[in-house]
Amino acid sequence: LMWLCFLAPAHADSKKEGIDVQDIVFSHIQDAYTWHITEWNGKEIAISLPILVKSEERGWDMFLSHHLHHGQAHHNYYIATEGEHAGKVVEKNSRGEEVRPVDLSLTKNVCGLFLSCGILLFVVLRTAHWYKRHPNQVPSGFTGLMEMIISYIQDGVIKESIGKEEYRPFSSYLLTVFFFILINNLIGIIPVFPGGANITGNIAVTAVLAGCTFIAVNLFATKEYWKEIFWPKAPIYLKLPLPIMPFVEFFGVFTKPFALMIRLFANIMAGHTIILALTCLIFITVSMGLLVNFGMTIVSVLFCAFMNCLELLVACLQAYIFTLLSANYIGLAKVKD
């Protein structure tokens, strides 16, 4: 229902003009230089975010994104509508070429990351402050919920996967990853500002998270782990003269974080896309008559409600799976003789 409230004003005249479903879906799941809130009386209500770019010819430049609305240009900068830089700020240089400047702009996903980090800090500091003030009391309410979640992740996932003697150096990282992914997933489900930022549906974010796990696994791995990589326990004909098994094992070093990255990205992106597509069915069937539109509205609302419940489950499940697999990979790298 909340998705309908935000999409309906923008496409109330869809019966006359029709709607571009692809444009609607991609505009909601992609990053942007503005944070769209809604539309009122045909006017877009959005927050213009600061754009910070560096031109090869003119150096640094900073301005608000509303200068680039509706294909406008500002200081030879504009947002490309097609090509490899579609949706990004590009510059028309003195030779008339379209080039991509150094872009350090504050986009919607970056603002969403700041928001999620602020929420994470608030949750952690509030819980720690309660324990500091009540060291001998049994927690209840929000603090009790946090203790239950932290205890389950640490004792049931981290300690069991890495080992009781080795888990402590990695506990803080894995707990941070779990809550960071969970909060970002939940923010993406909420269509109302300041929610709606598709943070974990951005492959750059999931790549950084997977990269952190990759570093944690390989930087703190034991000698036995690397021995198993380059000289695994396999028949000699699988290692010499062609190093088949060493190649497979070494290839697996990179496929594990790659799988983490794709799994989180694909699951979150798919959920958002399906919900938006189901919502668009209501506006597509406007021109098919009142009866068809009414029937599809009921079907779409029911399916959207089901998908939102499913996406809420996926949001929690993907945070858990990412943490579990990261802990397992770290545990496998801590193998001893």
Predicted segments — roles?
Residues 5-140:
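Perimembrane topogenic segments of multi-pass inner/organellar membrane proteins
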Residues 13, 18, 134-138, 165-167, ...:
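Alpha-helical transmembrane segments and their immediate interhelical/interface regions
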Residues 171, 175-190, 204, 208, ...:
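Hydrophobic alpha-helical transmembrane segments and adjacent short intramembrane/lumenal linkers
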Residues 192-196:
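Membrane-interface helix termini and inter-helical loops of multi-pass transporters
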Residues 122-161, 224-226:
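Hydrophobic transmembrane alpha-helix segments characteristic of membrane transport
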Residues 138, 199-203, 265:
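Short, non-helical or kinked segments that cap or interrupt transmembrane helices
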Residues 1-2:
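Sec-dependent signal peptide recognition
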Residues 100-113, 143-144, 148, 155-156, ...:
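Alpha-helical membrane-spanning segments of integral membrane proteins, especially the hydrophobic core
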